[in-house]
Design a protein with these regions (language model features):
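Short segments within alpha-helical structural elements
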Residues: 189, 215-240, 432-493
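Acidic, low-complexity, intrinsically disordered peripheral segments
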Residues: 7, 22-40, 320-325, 472-497
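Amphipathic alpha-helical coiled-coil scaffold segments and their short linker/junction regions
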Residues: 51-55, 206, 210, 240-355, ...
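Periplasmic alpha-helical coiled-coil/stalk elements that build and connect Gram-negative outer-membrane
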Residues: 155-273, 420, 424, 444, ...
Length: 497
């Protein structure tokens, strides 16, 4: 096809300029279970619908969203580190042999059953501002992850925009191929009738036009294949099953083509304020500045409050009292002698039982409380804090370099895309003039050919020039449009309609 190489060049240049990672995203998305992906494509697919579906189904975007949610959890946890601690514990044990009974501090040789319970609480009063700086660090990290997520969405948006415009461009190319074939068909019919009527020297004109018409059919077949391939590419980004009978809306008219109203410097200044990758790089610098402050905080003492309540119980506690149920006085069988002679010795025997404390009484009576102020001063811990601080400094410096690199890259990219836009606009304007000139030239040539003034070779040459100019003009329109959309993105003005 005579214009297929030009279209391929257009797509390649546009992809390289915007530095999109469409192929990586498509490869990662293909790893998903496409059978379970939502198929939201109906009979008509608009550009906003395509962007929405692609963002929803893209694996890279979903992974970035999960990462952002993880950073949100870390941020929540950083606040919760400042809350008091409150813990409860309890246990029950069965002991055999010689066992210390903690309730009465005595030993028992029988089987014992004992238990304990405690509640403890603590509150950190000062920790070198570690918690406060960690909160700020996690907040910056969370914000950076949201910018990374938005960058992925923007990447998908631009990729879908490019693929959608490629479909519109290829559809226009197909329509042009049909129109070119129609014009040649009219001329071929006329010359065929002349040949059938025995007109003078129509044979060479007829064979030339037959060859031209056959070339038109080849161009149509190639245009159809190119259009279908561009549709397949779009559906691979959408991660849905391919549907051939989908209508694509074209909201682009000739009135959309005008000189872009901005300078490269203005675009760059806007981009510095809104591009997610730039924001993410700066936020990561802020985050690791706070990470350095966190690591330095471990040099300082930790002051905390602590308290606890504990109790225990056993199945063989010490008796609290005893109850006498009867008293007996009996002779012991022994005697003592005094002036009156031998006298019997009596013994007093009391019968009764011991009263042991109930479980609830043990739980209450054996309870103990404690409260204290604790100070922990780091003196020497394998130089862990020192090395952590050194590592934090290196990490911070690395992210500062990344931030600087991101800014320089953005400036170069904006300038390059701006120059490409200017070139695309000039090219479009030249093709407007060329198409108009070649169209008029073909009109005159067609009249002269119809009148038999010129031969078919002049007709075919003029028509070929006109056809190429129309094809190039259609492609140039979409090239310029995409260039302007990229610059709109840099300024936060990109609209998907």
């Amino acid at each position: 096809m005579r214009y297929s190489s030009f279209i391929l060049l257009f797509l390649s240049a546009a992809l390289c300029t915007t530095r999109l990672t469409a192929q990586n995203n498509a490869a990662a998305t293909a790893a998903q279970n496409t059978a379970g992906a939502p198929d939201a494509v109906g009979s008509t697919l608009t550009l906003p619908q395509a962007v929405t579906i692609a963002i929803k189904n893209n694996l890279i975007v979903n992974q970035s969203d999960l990462s952002s949610q993880s950073y949100k959890i870390s941020f929540d946890q950083s606040w919760e580190y400042m809350l008091p601690t409150l813990n409860a514990s309890g246990g029950q044990s069965l002991n055999f042999g010689r066992t210390l009974v903690t309730t009465n501090n005595s030993y028992a040789t029988s089987e014992t059953n004992s238990g304990s319970a405690s509640i403890s609480a603590g509150l950190t009063l000062f920790h070198g501002l570690v918690y406060q700086n960690n909160i700020r660090m996690q907040r910056y990290a969370w914000d950076a992850s949201k910018m990374d997520l938005q960058a992925q969405k923007d990447n998908i948006t631009l990729t879908v925009l490019l693929d959608y415009l490629a479909i519109l461009s290829n559809r226009d190319q197909l329509n042009l191929a049909y129109e070119q074939s129609r014009v040649d068909s009219v001329s071929l019919d006329r010359v065929t009738k002349q040949a059938d009527a025995g007109a003078l020297n129509p044979v060479s004109n007829l064979t030339d036009l037959q060859g031209q018409y056959a070339s038109d059919q080849i161009n149509i077949a190639n245009a159809i294949n190119t259009l279908e391939q561009s549709k397949v590419t779009l559906f691979s980004i959408l991660n849905v099953s391919y549907k051939a009978d989908v209508e694509y809306q074209n909201t682009i008219t000739a009135t959309d083509i005008s000189q872009y109203p901005a300078t490269s410097d203005t675009i760059f200044q806007h981009a510095m304020q809104i591009i997610p990758t730039i924001k993410s790089a700066q936020l990561k610098v802020y985050a690791y500045e706070k990470n350095l402050a966190v690591q330095r905080g471990y040099y300082y003492p930790t002051i905390s409050l602590g308290g606890s309540v504990a109790t225990n119980w056993t199945n063989i506690p010490s008796p609290t009292s005893s109850v006498v149920t009867s008293t007996q006085i009996v002779k012991s069988g022994n005697y003592f002698t005094d002036a009156n002679g031998n006298n019997p010795v009596y013994t007093i025997t009391q019968n009764g039982y011991n009263i042991y404390p109930k479980f609830s009484d043990q739980f209450k009576n054996d309870r103990g409380e404690s409260f204290g102020l604790n100070v922990s001063i780091p003196i020497l811990n394998g130089l862990q804090t020192r090395n952590s601080v050194r590592q934090a400094k290196l990490t911070l410096k690395n992210y500062e370099y990344q931030n600087t690199t991101a800014r320089h890259t953005l400036q170069q990219t904006v300038e390059s895309d701006f120059q490409n836009m200017m070139a695309a606009y000039k090219t479009y304007k030249f093709y407007v003039q060329a198409a108009a000139a070649y169209k008029e030239s073909f009109r005159v040539t067609n009249i002269r050919f119809t009148q038999g003034v010129i031969a078919s070779d002049a007709y075919i040459l003029a028509k070929g020039n006109s056809d190429r100019a129309e094809v190039n003009l259609a492609a140039a329109k979409y090239i310029y449009l995409f260039r302007t959309k990229v610059l709109d993105y840099y300024q936060g003005k990109l609209t998907i309609e």
